[in-house]
Amino acid sequence: MAEYWQQLTNGAGEAGPGNESSAMADCNGGHESAAVGGSCNRHSNNNYVNFNQFIMQHNLGGGAPSNATSTMQHPVGSSYTNFSLGGGGGAFGLNPPVASASTSHFANVSHQSPNFYSQAMIPTYQNGDGIARVTVTSSYGSVNPSNSNFSSFYTPFGNNPFDFSASKLQASAPEFVPNFAKLSLEETPAAATTNGNSTASLETAINETRPRTLRAQEPAERGANNQCSNHNYERERERERDRDRDRERDRDRDRDRDRDRDRDRDRDSRPGNTRQQRRSDYRDDREDRYERSDRRRPQKQQRYDNHRSNKRRDDWNRNRDRINGFPRAVDDLDTSNESAHPSPEKQSQLQQISPRRGPPLPPADNEKLSQREKLVRDIEQRRLECLVCVEAIKSHQPTWSCRNCYHMLHLKCTITWASSSKSEVGWRCPACQNVLQDLPRDYLCFCGKLKNPPVSRTELAHSCGEVCCRIEGCSHACTLLCHPGPCPPCQANVVRSCGCGRSTKTMQCAMKEEVLCGEICDKLLNCGEHRCQAECHSGKCAACSEQVVQQCHCGKQERKVPCTRESQDKRTYSCKDSCGQPLPCGHHKCKDSCHAGSCRPCKLSPEQITSCPCGKMPVPAGQRSSCLDPIPTCEGICSRTLRCGKPAHPHQCGSKCHLGQCPPCPKQTGVKCRCGHMDQMIKCRQLCNRADDARCKRRCTKKRSCGKHKCNVECCIDIDHDCPLPCNRTLSCGKHKCDQPCHRGNCPPCYRSSFEELYCECGAEVIYPPVPCGTKKPICKLPCSRIHPCDHPPQHNCHSGPTCPPCMIFTTKLCHGNHELRKTIPCSQPNFSCGMACGKPLPCGGHKCIKPCHEGPCQSAGEICRQSCTKPRPTCGHKCAAACHEGACPETPCKELVEVQCECGNRKQNRSCQELAREHSRIATIQLASSMAEMSRGNYMELSEILAPAKKSNKTLDCNDECRLLERNRRLAAALSSGNSDTKQKCLTKYSEFVRGFAKKNPALTKSVYETLTDLVKLAKESKQRSRSHSFPTMNREKRQLVHELCEVFGIESVSYDKEPNRNVVATAHKDRCWFPATSIMEVLARESGQRRVPVPSNNAWGLKK
């Protein structure tokens, strides 16, 4: 194929002007792009060119007359040189391209040029139905008179166009073979119409696609020609981008180096930072950076794989459309030489990542990994976390691994955890709660052979790198390298026999399969006589099921027992009843329990009794001939040992020789109780036990082990005093009682469990059995489903409480007394109090309720009105002020305070109305007396003035020196015609009763405030600013009131800020609104206390003292 294409290229190059066909051949897919309306991209990354480029470059043709011609319109914006192909009769042809000034369509060009075989041909390019057809007609009839086609010279397939085995064409994938059901070189027009490949159908598809293709190519019309024809420009751009990336990478590397240098310099400058600490910190930082890089690498690899997969699928679809002859839009063409997601290798080169490859991607199904594989993966990817400190486990940090659950922890954390355990039997693993006895001290590898394993880049962290050799569950050692987690199942081959031992089988050691032969077991059973009749089985045979009959020794009973080795040898047993066999004497029967062998001789026989009961006198021979004869006694003392007396010297019977038991001892025995409290002599007949086992009646008063009850046992000798009483306290479940003996501390949790499902209130959540007693209902996150008193949706979740929380949605409600309508009252609150006075009329009819807004009646039963009467007095007009009453007001002196003043109004004082009435009465009496005196002298007096009621006036005080001083100042100011607006304020300086009273109690503070305000006014008058301020320190209410009232005297504004107890006053003096008072508060106090200030002598105009 390559040789043939080279021949075609060379032939066309020799014939055409400018050797333009060679340039066409250099562009991959050039003819193909022209055929489908695409663009030629020299640098397109197309992996599917082996078959498609060859087929499309030669434009399959056939099935149409050789003289049929049509015009192929080139898409708008394409600047490729128009070309035409030569061929005929379904053959392949190539003709050099002919330059044309038109860039929008292909024109029919008739060009005579010698071909590869030095034949002048007139090629015609036609594409009326979407499939390129070429007809080549010879221009010299003498050379080719029959107008034959040149298929034998132009087709690469030889005589058979579809014989792929005979051609040199090689397809790189099965999907590259064209769909011949859609495309055929020898297809007739009728067959093409049937298969959907007719000219009309394909031309319709092209016409529908062409407008969209033209619209897509219009924005790229400018410069498309330059991009395809001048690939040197693209190469230069690529080099420029590479240089920019290199410069950016160098800048990033320099910036990272500077940052690392600064960080190292700061770390080295810290106090107490040793070289070992810096090395450890550097190792931690390096591992952290590598972990972050490892976490990002799988994501980049996954994105790159997805991109490659999508690109491969798009390229396959495009090549399939090319083979089937369907047009392709420009948007589907991939003209980019670079991938949107570069490969991880390329990113690693650009970013200068460490050449060390990261761990592989984790498997999609994590459950398929064993615990050992998961631990290895987590160690390699540095994902392990300590369960105690919840920190990452580094490769250089000492670790400890549990031999039960194989969890890895920091060795330091494990030692701290084990040392803090308060259990007496050991300590528990934080992961599996397995009880361990020994405390971890050493840092060992996973297999335990190497102490303090070194950190190696080539071996797994925390391992020794040697063979594990651990033995778990069998006699074979693990053959893997030192690894975390449990060892894998043993793979050693072993020979196992069946249960009966007749057959054997070779299998892996880890296999738990039982070897059974299926025959009868036939092993001896436990009885040693019968054999097992069951099928071959593993383990011991069952006990023998046969029954053995046994008979008692006396012959009265018999029984059946299982057949065992003991029952086989023993055919008799003892029934424990009285034997009842007649004795040899013939008079008595055997009273022993059922026994084997012969019965013992009679105890009363002459052969058995040879002496008297005390044993001192032998029985004469011939005195007793049978067991029925009486036993003779002697006259001696019995002297048999009794139970009384001290253990070392017991008492003896003092009666004469006798038959039967000895009578009670008449002596006394010294008895000491076992607790040591009692030591006395008691009669032997009163002893119920031995002398050394006597007990007193003293009760023990010590506390028992529970610490709650007393021992209260008589003659107690216990040391621990365990409490035998039941605890009987209610357990944490609230339903059951503690059934353990009374103990100290809390009772254990209730051990009972319920085997019924435990549902929440609404039934959405459930806890399946077994449910421990006392377990609370499951937490449900659904809204509460109970019936609520209001219509609002519930704002709380499902709960198990007896009552629902109150509804807190704001509603609009009136207060108790209908004074105020508020919109922020919770729905669950039925009403509220606004805090205002109730104002409802009381039963007395003259007053209203003054209580804060409340619910219910204003007065309780039996309560009377306590308010003062508000009716006016007929004399003075003030209120009655007596307790609420019915009828006329009582005549009582009026105690209402009335303000009185002097004639000039400077002095003011509060007096009771009663005193003022007496003063008025005295003045009226004096006036009447003077009028009568004038009339007695014969002067004329107006009778109406005498009989008229006396006018009451509040100016009853006398003016003092201060009043006269103010009057003098006022007249002086009026005489001088002073226009000062502050004259009135300065001349009439008045201090309130509060200021004067406070100044008497605390003159130091009053003087300090007065001087501060004086300095503030002086500063404001002299300042260029409009006002000056001063902030007083934190004060209580009385001190702040003093400052406020003194500020009024100076004409200064005062404002209080902050909240109690940090409230203070800020005084602001305005330049044009403040003044100095005429008299200071100290002078007023001195004048009121009787201390007159003597004026200091001053020089007159002549320089002499007055």
Swiss-Prot record:
GO terms for cellular component: nucleus. It holds the Pfam family zf-NF-X1. A zinc finger (RING-type) spans 386-433. Residues 189-201 have a biased composition (Low complexity). Residues 232-270, 278-323 have a biased composition (Basic and acidic residues). GO terms for biological process: negative regulation of transcription by RNA polymerase II; protein autoubiquitination. The modification Phosphoserine is found at residues 336, 339, 343, 354. Residues 336-354 have a biased composition (Polar residues). A zinc finger (NF-X1-type) spans 474-492, 527-546, 585-604, 644-667, 706-725, 733-752, 844-867, 876-896. The modification Phosphothreonine is found at residue 335. Ovaries and embryonic central nervous system. Disulfide bonds: none annotated. One of its GO terms (molecular function) is DNA-binding transcription factor activity, RNA polymerase II-specific. Keywords: DNA-binding, Metal-binding, Nucleus, Phosphoprotein, Repeat, RNA-binding, Transcription, Transcription regulation, Zinc, Zinc-finger. It is found in: Nucleus. The keyword Transcription regulation applies. Residues 1006-1071 form the R3H domain. PANTHER family: NUCLEAR TRANSCRIPTION FACTOR, X-BOX BINDING 1 NFX1, TRANSCRIPTIONAL REPRESSOR NF-X1. Belongs to the NFX1 family. Plays an essential role during the late stages of embryonic neurogenesis. May either fine-tune the guidance or the spatial maintenance of the migrating SNB and in nerve roots, which are composed of axons originating from distinct groups of motor neurons and may be required to either guide or maintain the position of these nerves along a direct and straight path to their ultimate targets in particular muscle fields. May play a role in egg chamber development and/or may confer essential maternal contributions to the early embryo. This is Protein shuttle craft. It comes from Drosophila melanogaster (Fruit fly). The gene is stc.
